[in-house]
Structure formats: structure tokens, C-alpha cells
Amino acid sequence: MIHLVLLSGGSGTRLWPLSNSTRSKQFLKVLRDADGNHVSMVQRVFGQIGSVDADIDITVATCSSQQESIRRQVEGGYALVLEPERRDTAPAIMLACASLALEQGAGTDDTVIVMPIDSYADQAYYDSVVRLDEAVQSDFAELVLMGVQPTYPSGTYGYIVPATGEGWP
């Protein structure tokens, strides 16, 4: 079985002044769906995942300040795991996995896929995400890291930006 964990805990201030510490970017309806309706990143991601596998088990790891925004934008069909306080990515993943194992009945042979709730990728990316289970279950891999080709280096996304100057290439 596949368990998809969507991470939604950041403050999402990259679109300031539209987004800020109380109104994260993933909830802003700045995108358009196939029908031309305004949707948020959260709604777009849920729609893309649902079009590939409507029955996939989804858990959203978030903080208490975002739970109502998520509930307003996406109706049911997922579990919410609330972080007691923001501690960044690794603790959020561990908390979600603990919830999957201890509260939601995930088995040791299940596949857990973790991704941000505000990813912006084309449909082919989401088609590939749900196929990761095939790689894991066939013993091709036990850990898979999947991403998109960056268009430029940016320190704000966690890329390493080398220094320049004397002694540096």
C-alpha cells in the first residue's frame, strides 16, 4: 500500500506581500485549473494526485495554524497530523511516519512517499510519484529521491551556492 505524506508547515513567505507568516503561499488561489478556475497550490496538488490515484492514502503533516486553511480548501479523504511546534522537515516526516505506523495501521512493507504540499510540477511528475511503489516493492530500491531539474541555483531552496573570490574556483 502507498501512503503519501504531504508536508505543509512552512510559513510560505516567498510571495510577500501576498503571503506572510499567517497566510502561507500554498493557500493563495493564484493558479488556474483546467476549467480556468482559481485554485491554490494545495488544491492543485490534491487534484493532480487524485487524477492519478483517487484512492491513495494521504496524510498531511502540518501545524495547528494551517489546519483550518487545509480543511477549507480540501474536503476529507486525508488524515491530518499536527506538529506540536514547527521543527522543520525531518521531525515533521518522523511524526507523520509514527502516526502512519501507530495510529493509521501502516505495515512494514508499505511504501511511504513524502513531498511538499506546494510543489509545482506537471502531471507527468505525479504520474511518476505513484509509480515509485513499483520500484520499492520490486526491491529495486528501498529509498528513492525524486525531484525536478532546477532551472537555476538558489540558496533559498536549499541548493548549495558556491562562494566566489580568492581561493574559490
Regions found by a protein language model. Give the residues of each.
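N-terminal glycine-rich phosphate-binding loop and ensuing alpha1 helix
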Residues: 1-70, 76-87, 99, 126, ...
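Proteins with a high burden of low-complexity, intrinsically disordered sequence enriched in S/T/G/P/A and R
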Residues: 16, 167-169
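Conserved beta-loop-beta/alpha segment of the NTase-like Rossmann-fold superfamily
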Residues: 75-166
